[in-house]
A protein has these predicted regions:
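Catalytic glycan-binding domains that act on GlcNAc-containing polysaccharides
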Residues: 1-121
Length: 121
């Protein structure tokens, strides 16, 4: 049972409120918070949510990953603030944890893209 300092649960570190929201969107009426510890549920919810965020932010991976970590509300605020956004693109992330998270995800993405270049075409 993996729980972050912030209370995110399971393999894909989903916050309980987000889990309930996802369950509602997926029509999972009997969802319980403890199901976030079940890998099959957690991965399905996390993948669905990441796809939702990618769709919400026009396929921009950096922005979607930032929203996965910091929440879409925070990211929308940053996108509307010239201190953090240039030309509708997230230029600077004010939360250090989120900025580091986005960098780690991008490094992993680049690494796996190279590693599986032949399979990905």
């Amino acid at each position: 049972t993996v729980v972050s300092r912030a209370g995110a649960k399971g393999l894909m570190q989903i916050m309980p409120d987000t889990g309930f929201w996802i369950a509602e969107k997926l029509g999972e009426e009997d969802f319980t918070e403890d199901e976030l510890f079940e890998p099959k549920v957690n991965i399905r919810f996390g993948c669905w949510y990441l796809k939702y965020l990618l769709d919400s932010f026009s396929g921009n991976r950096k922005t979607a990953v930032a929203a996965y970590n910091a929440g879409p509300g925070n990211v929308r605020k940053w996108l509307n603030d010239e201190n953090y956004s240039k030309g509708g693109e997230l230029d600077r992330i004010p939360f250090k944890e989120t900025a580091q998270y986005v960098e780690r995800v991008q490094r992993a993405y680049d690494k796996y893209t190279k590693l599986y270049a032949n399979e990905l075409g």
